[in-house]
């Protein structure tokens, strides 16, 4: 999108994802983006994290802090986020709308909708279009947000106002949170290493419209292998 509109793009990518998923990085660089592994030495917030935790593999909260800091210090620079916030959740609902249409074409309707959750964009995208029918009283579908056991904001966090980033640059957001200074474990799913859940998802959990489960990493790998061997699709 930046290339299409003639914009210079800088992306702060969670370091563990930067290292483990080089093809994503290569795609962005091919289109002209500067991709920085977060935490980095290019920002005050990044340097602080690396000074305190030299081998830290990053988190969404740290990457958000670095991106906001760059935007605040660079003239004519704008910051955009790909998770957590309400407008991002709305954009992602195209996923659920397409899924709803596919189910309709197959003559089916889901009893349960499950999605992974870090900041909330994936879960929002798949669940919100179906959830509107439950809120209207037309359906009785269950919704399950699956989070890492090492980052259990919905199952063990507290619902309160908290910052969306580690350095405390963002406005306070009502969310289930483990605290914006929470240090997540170095799990493979870098995009799920986030201390809180978006405000809409958090409110839905508080109102008992969705459920949440925390799953250990090895169990997800085992389930993924089983699914691949039985269904022929690598999840």
Task: Locate predicted features.
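Active-site-proximal loop->helix
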Residues: 1-57, 153-163
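Short Gly/Thr/Asp-enriched flexible loops that form oxyanion-binding sites at enzyme active sites
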Residues: 1-5, 123-133
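Buried hydrophobic positions in well-ordered alpha/beta secondary-structure cores of metabolic enzymes
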Residues: 2, 28, 99, 113-115, ...
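Active-site/ligand-binding loops adjacent to catalytic centers
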Residues: 43, 48-87, 95, 107, ...
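Generic beta-strand/beta-sheet core signal
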Residues: 12-14, 38, 82, 115-117, ...
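Phosphate/pyrophosphate-binding loops at sites that engage ATP/ADP/AMP, CoA/4′-phosphopantetheine
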Residues: 101-108
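Phosphate-handling active-site elements
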Residues: 5-14, 133-145
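Gly/Ser/Thr-rich loops at beta-strand to alpha-helix junctions
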Residues: 1, 17-18, 88, 117-123, ...
């Amino acid at each position: 999108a930046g290339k299409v509109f003639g914009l210079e793009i800088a992306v702060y990518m969670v370091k563990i994802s930067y290292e483990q998923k080089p093809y994503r990085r290569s795609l962005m660089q091919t289109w002209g983006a500067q991709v920085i592994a977060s935490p980095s030495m290019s920002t005050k917030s990044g340097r602080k994290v690396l000074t305190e935790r030299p081998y830290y593999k990053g988190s969404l909260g740290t990457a958000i802090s670095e991106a906001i800091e760059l935007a605040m210090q660079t003239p004519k620079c704008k910051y955009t986020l790909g998770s957590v916030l309400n407008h991002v959740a709305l954009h992602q609902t195209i996923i659920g709308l397409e899924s709803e249409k596919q189910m309709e074409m197959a003559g089916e309707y889901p009893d349960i909708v499950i999605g992974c959750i870090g900041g909330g964009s994936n879960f929002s995208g798949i669940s919100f279009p179906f959830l509107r029918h439950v809120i209207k009283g037309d359906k009785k579908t269950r919704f399950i947000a699956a989070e890492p056991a090492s980052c259990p904001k919905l199952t063990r966090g507290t619902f309160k106002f908290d910052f969306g980033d580690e350095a405390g640059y963002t406005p306070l957001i009502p969310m289930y949170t483990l605290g914006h200074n929470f240090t997540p474990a170095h799990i493979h799913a870098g995009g799920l290493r986030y201390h809180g859940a978006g405000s809409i998802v958090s409110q839905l959990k508080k109102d008992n419209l969705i459920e949440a489960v925390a799953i250990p990493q090895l169990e997800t790998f085992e389930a993924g292998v089983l699914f691949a061997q039985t269904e022929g699709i690598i999840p």
